[in-house]
Regions:
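Conserved long alpha-helical elements within nucleotide-processing catalytic cores of c-di-GMP signaling
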Residues: 1-4, 8-33, 43-47, 59-67, ...
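A short glycine-enriched loop-to-beta-strand structural element that forms part of the catalytic core
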Residues: 1-3, 40-55, 78-111
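Short catalytic/binding micro-motifs of nucleotide second-messenger systems
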Residues: 34-39, 71-81
C-alpha cells in the first residue's frame, strides 16, 4: 500500500504557518524513521507531505500504522495529532487500473 501523510492546519487545509510547518515536518520525518517497519520506505513528497510504501500489509493495518505514527508524532505535543491526515491506496490497484477513478481512501483521525 501507498500512504500519504500530510500536515494540515487541523481543519484539512494546508498549513500556512511556515515556522510551525518546518518544526512539524522535522518531527514527522523523525517519527517515520522511528515508527516504520523494516522493509517499509518513505520519502518527502512536499514540505507538508511524506509518501510511504508499506510492504506486506493490508488496508485494515494501514490505519493501525497511521495511529502508531500519530501517537509518536504527538508524544511531546499532544495537540499535534489533529494536524496529521492520511490517505491510502493499493499500489497494485493503481498499476492495474484501466480507469481513471480515484482509488484513494481518505482517513481523517477525527472521524472515529
Amino acid at each position: 500500500y501507498l500512504m500519504l501523510c500530510s500536515i494540515t492546519n487541523g481543519k484539512g487545509q494546508p498549513m500556512k504557518n511556515e515556522e510551525r510547518l518546518d518544526m512539524m515536518g522535522k518531527e514527522l520525518q523523525d517519527t517515520l524513521a522511528h515508527c516504520l517497519r523494516r522493509g517499509d520506505s518513505y520519502t518527502r513528497y512536499s514540505k507538508s507531505q511524506y509518501l510511504l510504501l508499506l510492504v506486506g500489509t493490508n488496508r485494515e493495518n494501514c490505519s493501525l500504522i497511521f495511529e502508531r505514527i500519530q501517537k509518536y508524532f504527538s508524544r511531546e505535543h499532544k495537540t499535534w495529532s489533529k494536524y496529521l491526515e492520511y490517505a491510502v491506496s493499493s499500489w497494485r490497484t493503481r498499476i492495474n487500473s484501466e480507469d481513471n477513478e480515484n482509488k484513494w481512501k481518505w482517513g481523517k483521525t477525527w472521524d472515529k
